[in-house]
Amino acid sequence: MKAQLKKFILLSLNACDGLPMPQSALVGAVQNLARPGQPTKSDVEDALKAVEREGFCEGVSDEFSETTWTLTTKGIHQARKL
């Protein structure tokens, strides 16, 4: 399931066309795409951290809002192959 969640993360971020996506929206989008599997928030966040470690996306957080996520160049390339 983790591989599928990682794929859905890339697809969701790619659909934003470069705009940062808030983490709560990303988690919700991935959970919707993964139906009927019903991954938990923790499952999605674990997959998100794995995608970040692999260099496909990066998250930015500050004191004013939640973490937002975007694809890296490597992530854009990978997402376009899916």
Outline where the language-model segments fall.
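Intrinsically disordered, low-complexity serine/threonine- and proline-rich regulatory segments
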Residues: 1-5, 55, 69, 81
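Short acidic, hydrophobic short linear motifs in intrinsically disordered regions
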Residues: 19-32
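Cationic, hydrophobic amphipathic alpha-helical membrane-interacting segments
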Residues: 33, 62-64
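Short amphipathic alpha-helical interaction segments
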Residues: 37-53, 66
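A short, conserved structural fragment
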Residues: 52-62
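Minor-groove-contacting beta-hairpin "wing" of winged helix-turn-helix DNA-binding domains
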Residues: 64-71
